[in-house]
Amino acid sequence: AGEAHLEKLLGQAMRDPDRPEELTPEQARILGHVEQAMRAEFIFKRNKDYLVQAGKVIIVDEFTGRLMPGRRWSDGLHQAVEAKEGVTVQQDNVTYATITLQNYFRLYSKLAGMTGTALTEAEEFDKIYSLAVVAIPTNLEYQALRADSGLMEMEYKEDGQKFFYFARKEDPQTPALWRRKDFPDVVYRTEEAKLRALVMQILQRHCLGQPLLVGTTSVETSERVSDRLRADALQRLAQVMLIRAAWFEKNNRAEDGMAVPELQPLDAPLDKLSRNDLAKWLRDLGLSTNPAGEENLARLARVLGLPESAQTRLMEALQSGIKHNVLNAKKHDEESRIIADAGALGAVTIATNMAGRGVDIKLGGELAEEVLTAVNRVLRKAGHADPYDLTNEQRKAELLQIPESEQGIYQAECRLFLEEMEGAGRVKEAGGLHVVGSERHEARRIDNQLRGRAARQGDPGSSQFYLSLEDELMRRFGGQGVSDLMQ
């Protein structure tokens, strides 16, 4: 049917009726162009697979989330995408020879490598390259599990899940070093339900002062999550939360995750919900229409499980939105600044795979090099032999012993250093960096790399993935059948 429609459009036959299995070179060329045009139109998505910048189509690496300027898809696909986007169609690349990565690596007599996610691909390394994968203990485990370390591993439970930390043998109840808390995935039937739960998690932890890194699979998704953190979207979500909580309370029912026909109108996409309709729901339940009002604020805090001390941050978030940074291929030139702030108290960073590997997020925020240099000079002047070998905690302890009057021209830098260290302490008390994944990747190692941004070098930290049966990966592998069962 597709070829018949194409023949009608072009006014020429695409195959010889007597020998349909054979194609002329011209017919093969036209069918190839048509196939690439269909791929460009229906499979390759703007702000996911590529960006359009300065009149050019630039590929986005699906594994790293970074731009690949100068790279072009082959066989006319790049030209088809250029035609789709209305930019100048450039000459196609000519390929003289190709080789697979597997065969390329086999050209070497010696082959070795190192990565933090090799174990997930151990079978492939053995099968294709005859390479064994050896797991090297992390620095934390090496230090903690030595016989002379004075540390012991302790188990505890949180939300029904088992987690571990290292404590000194003389004080086993006080954690000295942490292992990351990987919470189980949460799966929702619709993307809308997932987005709401994701934003509620961000709002809750932001109000507690815990920094968050929200991982997304595309530029488009990162911008969609960013839109949900604006004040108007948060207020609308808060109204829905208030209505649901009040309805269940009024009808003496517990919220068990099952669909409630009476509340089904609230399941529509958030931007489609009428403010007037939400206001009517609230008034009928005897509530104020202002989600930031005193009574509503206290009710929202209970729904989110927040202490009274967090209500001020909750009110600020509802009134002004949640201040956050977005790191994607469009903002690659701001990467260092965004990453430097990602571990600050209450910071929220929404990022594509760019933040999933090779990124070290410091709790409390990154200390400027000039601040550390100034502190080291003060310590050296005070008689410390080599302050550059100290950890920041040790620098803090030493600096507190030096009066401000002896800090000379570096008083401001020393004060800033102590403030940053105090902020880092508060972040650790809040639970460290929490990583939230908005979708699973096709390659498990990319998910592991994202999780690995939290709880580095014994710092506290946690991770969790929020999924829906409408996610691309779920749709590809039978999510519709599970969705029908959930209904």
Segments the model singles out, each with a brief description of its role:
Residues 1-487:
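Conserved P-loop NTPase motor core
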